[in-house]
Swiss-Prot record:
InterPro entries: Helicase_ATP-bd, Helicase_C-like, P-loop_NTPase, SEC_C_motif, SecA, SecA_CS, SecA_DEAD, SecA_motor_DEAD. The gene is secA. Its main location: membrane. Its cofactor is Zn(2+). Disulfide bonds: none annotated. Zn(2+) binds at C890, C892, C901, H902. GO terms for molecular function: ATP binding; metal ion binding; protein-exporting ATPase activity. Residues 858-877 have a biased composition (Basic and acidic residues). This is Protein translocase subunit SecA. It catalyses: ATP + H2O + cellular proteinSide 1 = ADP + phosphate + cellular proteinSide 2. SMART domains: SecA_DEAD (SM00957), SecA_PP_bind (SM00958).
Amino acid sequence: MVSFGGFARKIFGSSNDRRVKTLRQRANQITAIEKNYENLTDEQLQAKTAEFRAALAGGKTLDSLLPDAFATAREAAKRVLGMRPFDVQLIGGMVLHERGIAEMRTGEGKTLMATLPVYLNALEGKGVHVVTVNDYLATRDAETMGKLYNFLGLTVGVIKHGLDDDERRAAYACDITYGTNNELGFDYLRDNMKYERAQMVQRPHNYAIVDEVDSILIDEARTPLIISGPLEDRSDFYNLIDTFIPALEPEDFEIDEKQKTAIFTEVGTEKVEQLLEAAGHLKGESLYDIENVAVVHHLNNALRAHKLFQRDKDYIVRNDEIVIIDEFTGRMMPGRRYSEGLHQALEAKEHVTIQPENQTLASITFQNYFRMYNKLSGMTGTAATEAEEFGNIYGLEVLEIPTNLPVQRIDEDDEVYRSVEEKYRAIVRDIRASHEKGQPILVGTTSIEKSEQLAERLRKEGIKEFQVLNARYHEQEAYIIAQAGVPGTVTIATNMAGRGTDIQLGGNLEMRVRQELSDIPEGPERDAKIAEIKADIAQLKEKALAAGGLYVLATERHESRRIDNQLRGRSGRQGDPGRSKFFLSLQDDLMRIFGSDRMDSMLQKLGLKEDEAIVHPWINKALEKAQKKVEARNFEIRKNLLKYDDVMNDQRKVIFEQRLEMMDEEDLTETVGEMRHEVIEDMVALRIPKDAYAEKWDIAGLKEDIISKLNLDLPVEDWAKEEGIAEEEFENRIKEAADKAAAEKAERFGPQIMTYVEKSVIMQSLDNLWREHLVNLDHLRSVVGFRGYAQRDPLNEYKTEAFELFQSMLANLREVVISQLMRVEIVREAPPEPELPPMTGRHIDSTTGENDFDEASWSDHQHDERNVPAAERDPADPRTWGKVSRNEACPCGSGKKYKHCHGAFE
C-alpha cells in the first residue's frame, strides 16, 4: 500500500527534485551562453576577471554575476584542464554558492565542481578557503586546480604541515587557499595567542567550501582542537596504576560497550584499595575520600585503556608512540592525543615512553570554528542521512545532485551468518570466485586487526595478489587505492570514508605516470610513454568492465549508514557497472551491541546449518533500523555537547575580541585607568560596605589591600578618624593617589614604553587567567551532570556557574594587571659596554615576588649607576636614588628594607 506522502511525491516530486529542477533551468541558461565564451581569445577570457571585479565595485552582486562567472570558469577548465564541467556540476556549484551541501556520488567530479563557486566568490578578494581532510589532497587539488585559477588571474595558496608563519600568512593572503581542517583550526588558535596583529596569519573568515563535509562537521564534531603545554612528569605513577589492572578478575569491573564506559564494582574497589594501600598511595580511609580524587581518575583511565581500547583498532604503536586511529576513516592521526590522562594510560599499557600530561592553552571544536565563517558550504558523496543535523546545527540544506549518467551498480542484499568464522569462510570463497574471473575487488573492513586477519586467510588459501590499505601503510594510500580498479586486483582496506582518491577501472593514469615516469623529462619520449600507459589502461578497463566492474565486498556494517554508503559508492562511478554486498555475522559488533534481539532469536530458531546464510530484504531493514538508533543517539550526544561548548565559545569570543582590541590600541591610558578605578571600587566596597557603621569598617584590611594591589602606603587609619567621612571619600582619595602614582610612572617610562608595558601585562595576564579558566570549566563540566540527581538541569547549572566563573576571572584580571603595573619599574642592569647600558622592563607577580616574564629591552634611555646621598634622593623618582644597599631602608619611604620593596624587582 502506497502512503499518501509517497503518492504525492510520485505526482509532484520530492522537495529535492523540485529544487534541482529550478537550478537546472539556471544551468541551461549558462549552457546557452557557452558558445559566446568559446569564441573569446585567451586574453579576452582572462580579462573577464577584472571586468567582474569592476562590476562588483560598481555595486553588482555575486548572484547577478553567477551565470557569466560560471561560464568563464567552465571555458577556462576546458582550455587549461581539458575538462568540461557537466550541467549537474553547474547545479552543484550553485548549491555551494548558496550556502548548501551538495551530495554528489563518487567519481562525479566534486573537485572540478567546486572551481565554479570558488572562482565566483574569490572575485570579492576577501578570501575563499577550500577545506580537505589531509595534506595530500590539499596539495594535489591546489596544484591541479591552481592552473585554472592562475589562468584567470587569481592567486592560490596551500596550508599544510611544516610551514612557518610567513609562508602561512602569504597563503592566507591569496584569493584562494587550500588547507586541512586541522591546520586552519590550529592557525586560528595560534593567532589568538599572538601579541601583535602583524604576527597573525589568518584573515577574517569569509567563505569556506568543506570537502568530505560529513567527515569534518559530523564525525569530527566531538573532537576539539587543543593547543596545550606540558605539566609535571607523572610517568612512575601511571606505570604503578597500570600494574593493578591485569590483577583484576571479571567480577571486579563492569563494561558497557554501548555507552563506552568501564567502572569498578564494589569488589574491584576493595581490591584496588588494598593494592594502593600496599603501595603507599591511599590517603584517608577510603578510595573515594576527597584526597584520592586524582587517584580514582587515574584508575578509571587505566581500566578504560585496558578494557575499552583495542590495539590495531583504536590505536597503533609506532616509533615508541601511541598513534590514534580515526574510527570513521581508519586513518592514523599523528599529533593527536587523548586528553585528561587517557593517552598516558594507553602509553603505560603498551610500555612505551609516557609523555607528560598537558594543560589546555586554547581549544575550539570544528563545529564552532566553521560557524565563524560568513558563508559556509560543503560537498560529499553521502550527507542525506545527516540532513537534519546539518540543518539544525549549521543551517545548511543538503541537496542530492543527480548523476551525469545513470548508476548501474547492483547493491545485493546482506548475507548473515551465525558466526564470524562462517562469515570469513564465505568471504574467502566469494573473493576467490570473483578474482578468478578477473573482477577488481575492494574489501572493506572495520579495523587494522580485521584487515590483517583477512589478509592472512587469503594467503593460506593461495590468493597472493592482494594489497592491504590501513593505517600501517598510510603513506602508500593514494597509490594503492588508485590501482584498485585494475582487473583481478584485490584491495583490503579499512573504512573508506574521506579517502578522496577515485578508483578508476583499469587504473589511474596520473598515478601511473607519476610512479613510472618520474625520471623522464618533458619531451617526445615522455609523451610516447604516456600514450602507451593510456592504451594499457584502456585495455585493462575493457577487461574490468567485462568482468562486471568493481566489486565492493564489505565484511561488516558500520554504526553509521553513511560510512556504509561511502564504501558502496566506490563502485559504479560515472555509469560504470559494479556490485556491492555486505557479509555479516551475529557476532559482529553492531549486531551484538545494537542489533534486534528478535532477529537473533529468529535466526537461531531457523536452525541454519553450518556455512549457510540467510539473505532477505527484511534483514537489511532491521539493520538499517539499528543503525538509525545509533545515529540518533550520536546526534543527541553531539547536540548536547554543542550546547555546553557554546557556553565556552561565547566566552572565547569575548576574550579573543578583547585581545584584538588590545593589539589595535595605541594608547591604553584610559582603559588601564578604568581598570584601576574598578579595582579600587571593589576594594572599598569589600572593606567599607555602603551605609555600614564606622565600627564595621575593616580599615586594616583596606590598608593591606592598598599595599598589595596598588603598591601604595596611604594613611587610611587617619582618614577613618575624620568626622563624617564616607566610603565615596575613601574611593576618591585612593583613586587620586593611585592615578598620580601611575601618571608619574608613565612620565618616567615615556608613552611608547608605557603602552608596550601595559599591553604586555594585560595580554599575558589575560592568557594566563584564560588557561586557568579553561581548566575550571573542564572541572565544572565533569561534575555538573550529577546535579540531575537533585532534579536540577545540568545545562542551566553549567551556564550559571560558568558565567560566575567568567565574571570572577575578569575581576581577577583587573586586580592582577593593576597590581603588576603599579609595581613595574625600569631596572638598570650592568651594561656590556659603558656607552650602551640596556634597560629591561619586567613584570613581577605580586603574590610570589617572582619575575613573571621578561619581554622587552630598551636602550634608548641611558642612566649612570652611582651612589647618591640620601638628602639628594627624591622618594617619588627612583632615577635620583643611585645605588642602594639591599638591606638599607627603601628611599621611597615605605619603611621596608630595599630588598623587600623596590629592590625585590631587580
